[in-house]
Curated annotation (Swiss-Prot):
Gene3D superfamilies xref list: Pancreatic trypsin inhibitor Kunitz domain (4.10.410.10)
Function according to Swiss-Prot or TrEMBL: TAP is a slow, tight-binding inhibitor of blood coagulation, specific for factor Xa.
All copies of domain BPTI/Kunitz inhibitor, residue ranges: 5-59
GO molecular function terms noted in the UniProt entry: serine-type endopeptidase inhibitor activity
Protein name: Tick anticoagulant peptide
Family annotation (SUPFAM superfamilies): BPTI-like
Length: 60
């Protein structure tokens, strides 16, 4: 099945960024807005990607 690229709910700070029609989210407490996306894994936690497109390509 297709895994969605999502933000981890417990780390979130939103910045004014929008890539490919999707909102980017950012890790709290990292200083500035370094974007990341996660691709959830059932058994291994999550893979992290710096752009929505990279995440999308890996998840689908």
């Amino acid at each position: 099945y297709n895994r969605l690229c999502i933000k981890p709910r417990d780390w979130i700070d939103e910045c004014d960024s929008n890539e490919g029609g999707e909102r980017a989210y950012f890790r709290n407490g990292k200083g500035g807005c370094d974007s990341f996306w996660i691709c959830p894994e059932d058994h291994t936690g999550a893979d992290y990607y710096s752009s929505y497109r990279d995440c999308f390509n890996a998840c689908i």
